[in-house]
Amino acid sequence: MAHKKAGGSTRNGRDSNPKMLGVKRFGGERVLAGNIIVRQRGTHYRPGENMGMGRDHTLYALIEGKVKFTRKGPKKRNFVSIEPLEESQP
């Protein structure tokens, strides 16, 4: 004879691993070519000057410089660009 009531089952208990999305380098920060600026799903931020976009919509720097976030166009879309660093004169 059972001394414990049979336990029910649950349909919960699952969770997905974190995807580490978001802005990785903020406006004004100095970056190197190849640095990831934004990891995202879809194109919340769009690539501006001197930026590349990976097939998963990751934005990365194509040159060394400073990160700049802007809003452009009639729909005020977010663009991320890289401003080249001024070369110091010897």
UniProtKB/Swiss-Prot annotation:
Molecular function (GO) terms for this protein are:
structural constituent of ribosome
Instruction: Identify the keywords attached in UniProt to this record, alphabetized.
Output: Ribonucleoprotein, Ribosomal protein
Q: Which cellular components does GO assign to this protein?
A: cytosolic large ribosomal subunit
Establish whether keyword Ribonucleoprotein is in the entry.
Answer: yes
* InterPro entries per record: Ribosomal_bL27 (IPR001684), Ribosomal_bL27_CS (IPR018261)
Q: Name one GO biological process term.
A: translation
Could you tell me which residues belong to the region Disordered?
1-22
Q: Is Ribonucleoprotein found in the keyword set?
A: yes
Looking up HAMAP family in the UniProt record yields: Ribosomal_bL27
Q: Which family does it belong to?
A: Belongs to the bacterial ribosomal protein bL27 family.
Q: What is this protein called?
A: Large ribosomal subunit protein bL27
